[in-house]
A protein has these predicted regions:
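Non-cleavable N-terminal signal-anchor transmembrane helices
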Residues: 1-111
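Active-site nucleotide/adenylate-binding loops and adjacent lid/helix of ATP-dependent enzymes
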Residues: 2-4, 9-10, 14-25, 54, ...
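Conserved N-proximal alpha/beta basic substrate-recognition cap immediately N-terminal to
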Residues: 59-173, 184
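Short glycine-rich anion-binding loops that position phosphate/pyrophosphate groups of nucleotides
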Residues: 120-122, 200-201, 330
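Phosphate-binding site of ATP-dependent enzymes
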Residues: 205, 209-300, 322-323
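A short glycine-rich, hydrophobically flanked beta-strand micro-motif that places a catalytic Asp/Glu
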Residues: 245, 306-319
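C-terminal active-site "lid" helix and adjoining low-complexity regulatory extension at the edge
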Residues: 288, 315-383
Length: 383
């Protein structure tokens, strides 16, 4: 349903969200609750405080995404802006809402010190938000989360792969080429089966396993044709680029590690029977994460210079190594328990890499990053 919904123009989606049929389905899927129920959900995590008395406080602009509004008195309880708003309220941070989709977005932004949003993952929204954050940050001098650097690498596997290559990070052998002749050479170099991906796509959307030369040649011919290949988004086609990744046949799970400041969270993900894709399968397990994997994720986040990052890792028993599958600025957060060990929710304190410790607690990751962004703004404002 989610994939099909991406095919629909935004103005049509907006009207559909108002219908009883859409609302009923959303309620059934727990992606819509009454506004009166939101506070109960948010209070699953204790109030997060700044832990510092700020002499100056920023005026924060919170960007709402249209996909969070179901219509009437219902809303998607997973919407990140609800957590941003909660943090501002609990810490007496002045805030307002910014509709960045309108033509007067620049004028409306002038009054704010800090703009924060959790972007929609479709390419149309990504292109818009990337362009506007560039103006906000580099021309208007606004503090933004995500920053232009952070949004540039989000939901773009090609760009992320360039950064892995530049920093020499241990990724699954992956190649991105815009050259048809080289694409034909790469399929022989990597061997079968191999994984191919579209540059934009989450929850394993756009990820395919290619098993035979016939499939590979057909895909390459189509990708480098005049029209390219259709993707999950009807207005965007895969054209003149080929993303090929070695298939690691002895991997039985992957790890998602999420990092904010000096805190790390994470869990194991498993594919459905008969499938190779763990992302989007919904099969997760929360338990202790190996320190080797944590340190690799920390290194990746540091090199990619992102204040919040999810790092997906795969473990090969044969090679006794963890490899980067991909990274993401935003991950879906359904619960304030993103790490649980022996039934106890908490996080890893990674302030000392030689002494990583598990500490108890429940947190909304969105609140943690907003806290860090506000403190960062405060320190810069004192200079």
């Amino acid at each position: 349903m989610k994939t099909k919904f991406n095919f629909i123009p935004e103005f049509v989606k907006k009207e559909l969200r108002k219908t009883d049929a859409y609302k009923s389905r959303a309620i059934h899927n727990k992606t819509a609750v009454k506004y009166s129920e939101v506070e109960v959900i948010l209070n699953e995590a204790p109030v997060l405080r700044l832990e510092k008395d700020l002499k100056m406080k920023p005026l924060v602009a919170i960007v709402k995404t249209q996909e969070s509004i179901v219509g009437g008195d219902y809303i998607n309880p997973k919407a990140s802006w609800l957590r941003y708003e909660r943090f501002c309220k609990n810490n007496a941070i002045p805030y307002g809402f910014l509709d960045i989709t309108k033509s007067d977005w620049m004028k409306e932004s002038e009054m704010y010190d800090l703009i924060i949003c959790h972007t929609e993952s479709n390419p149309a929204y990504q292109e818009m938000i990337e362009s506007k954050i560039y103006i906000l940050e580099y021309y208007m001098g606004k503090a933004c989360f995500p920053s232009y650097h952070e949004i540039w690498q989000y939901e773009n596997k090609n760009r992320s792969n360039y950064l892995y290559d530049y920093y020499g990070l241990p990724k699954i052998p992956t190649y991105v080429t815009h050259n048809r002749d080289e694409a034909l050479e790469l399929i022989e170099k990597v061997g079968y089966p191999f994984i191919t991906k579209t540059t934009i796509g989450s929850s394993s959307i756009g990820v395919k396993k290619i098993n035979t030369p016939r499939e590979a040649y057909s895909l390459i011919n189509n990708v480098f044709s005049f029209k390219g290949v259709s993707t999950q988004y009807p207005y965007q086609r895969q054209k003149n680029y080929f993303y090929i990744q070695q298939f690691i046949d002895d991997a039985t799970f992957d790890l998602r590690i999420m990092l904010v400041g000096n805190m790390a969270f994470g869990y194991y993900r498993y594919p459905n029977k008969g499938d190779f894709r763990a992302s989007g399968a919904g099969n997760t397990e929360k338990k202790d994460i190996p320190k080797e994997a944590l340190r690799l994720a920390i290194e990746v986040r540091g090199k990619l210079n992102s204040r919040q990052m999810g790092v997906d890792l795969l473990y090969s028993k044969k090679n006794n190594n963890y490899y980067i599958i991909e990274t993401s600025l935003f991950n879906q957060i359904d619960t304030p328990e993103q790490l649980v060990i022996n039934g106890v929710p908490g996080y890893y304190d990674i302030s000392d890499l030689d002494n990583i410790k598990f500490k108890e607690g429940k947190f909304w990751i969105q609140e943690l990053v907003l806290r860090d962004v506000i403190l960062e703004w405060y320190e810069k404002s004192k200079r």
